[in-house]
Curated annotation (Swiss-Prot):
The gene is tsaD. The keyword Oxidoreductase does not apply. The lineage of its organism: Bacteria, Bacillati, Bacillota, Clostridia, Eubacteriales. It is found in: Cytoplasm. Its cofactor is Fe(2+). Required for the formation of a threonylcarbamoyl group on adenosine at position 37 (t(6)A37) in tRNAs that read codons beginning with adenine. Is involved in the transfer of the threonylcarbamoyl moiety of threonylcarbamoyl-AMP (TC-AMP) to the N6 group of A37, together with TsaE and TsaB. TsaD likely plays a direct catalytic role in this reaction. Pfam families: TsaD (PF00814). This is tRNA N6-adenosine threonylcarbamoyltransferase. PROSITE patterns: GLYCOPROTEASE (PS01016).
Length: 341
């Protein structure tokens, strides 16, 4: 079953509150994708507690890796390389996955490949059919990042714009808390917004100096002020506010992405990151792109949230390009999307 020419990559992900391992063949075929989520654990806290998350990763990392290998029907000896998230993320949780990956790479004499978590989200798009076609514009939108990227090919990236303050996903979480919704906030806001009027509450859209940059702090503040000014909200007011907020976010994301796609002359746009699972964003983006003859791609929701299949996919293309990392590879909590890789 091995197929040496395919390249079997074991991916490991532990950047936040998901302990994940996966085996991917040839950067495209998911043989297994095991995720142990801590969402239920942190729901009572309203967010991730780093120390608790790290301890839970320690308990889960080896069983999750074993399960991924068993589900894939492969042994450690058949793996060609070990790919692991080394940033960005929480330093304590990153170290758990990184330490496990180093131990495996050293013990098996296999290449170690450090993967940028954000690149992992991008490469989740290469695990679906049809795969994206270069050149393309990618919108990475998650709890910690909102980036607009031009990709001419594998490893050939240009950062076009990013958020100047809050990430879109962070704004979703904070607004969710302000209207009494649970954690994680994004899916809760999206669900509530379905029964609301997106035009009911006038909310600002930030204008940034950079044509492809984003800013959501003013929008978040406007929502908080509306809640304080209005007082206790009834169910319909909460739904209207959720819908109006969601529309304010998605309209800006769509407008900047379309502008970038037209400026770069691409025929392909892809979405990546947790917020890429948002149905309203997908629908509005598709409605804006299709009349322009631009294709829209995105992963299924299970590959939008943190997982190790995306890390293995990104790791495959790095492995194929000859990238190898030493065992002194560090966890980098604030790792950015490096231009060109």
């Amino acid at each position: 079953m091995k197929g040496l020419s395919e390249g079997l990559i074991l991916g490991i992900e532990s950047s936040c509150d998901e302990t994940a391992a996966a085996v991917v063949a040839g950067g495209r075929r998911v043989l297994s994708n095991t995720v142990a989520s801590q969402v239920d654990l942190f729901r009572k806290y309203g967010g991730v507690v780093p120390e608790i998350a790290s301890r839970r990763h320690l308990e889960l990392i080896l069983p999750v890796i074993r399960e991924a290998l068993q589900m894939a029907g492969v042994t450690l000896e058949q793996i060609d390389a070990v790919a692991v998230t080394h940033g960005p993320g929480l330093v304590g949780t990153l170290l758990v996955g990184l330490s496990a990956a180093k131990a495996l790479a050293f013990g098996l004499d296999k290449p170690l490949i450090g993967v940028n978590h954000l690149q992992g989200h991008i490469y989740a798009n290469f695990l679906v059919e049809p795969p994206p076609e270069f050149p393309l514009v990618c919108l990475v939108v998650s709890g910690g990042h909102t980036d607009l990227i031009y990709m001419a090919g594998h490893g050939r990236m240009e950062l076009l714009g990013r958020t100047l303050d809050d990430a879109a996903g962070e704004a979703f979480d904070k607004v969710a808390r302000s209207v009494g919704l649970g954690y994680p906030g994004g899916p809760q806001v999206e669900k509530l917004a379905r029964s609301g009027d997106p035009e009911a509450v006038p909310l600002p859209r930030a204008h940034t100096e950079g044509p492809y940059d984003f800013s959501f702090s003013g929008l978040k503040t406007a929502v908080l002020q509306y809640v304080q000014r209005t007082g206790p909200l009834n169910d319909q007011q909460r739904a209207d506010l959720a819908a109006s907020f969601q529309r304010a976010v998605t309209s800006v994301l769509v407008e900047r992405t379309v502008k970038a796609a037209e400026a770069k002359g691409v025929r392909q746009v892809i979405l990546a990151g947790g917020v890429a699972a948002n149905g309203a964003l997908r629908e509005e983006m598709r409605a804006a792109l299709e009349p322009r003859g631009i294709r829209l791609g995105y992963p299924p929701p299970v590959l939008c949230t943190d997982n190790a299949a995306m890390i293995a996919a990104a790791g495959y293309y790095l492995w194929r390009a000859g990238v190898r990392h030493d065992l002194d590879l560090n966890a980098v909590p604030g790792l950015g999307l490096g231009i060109g890789g």
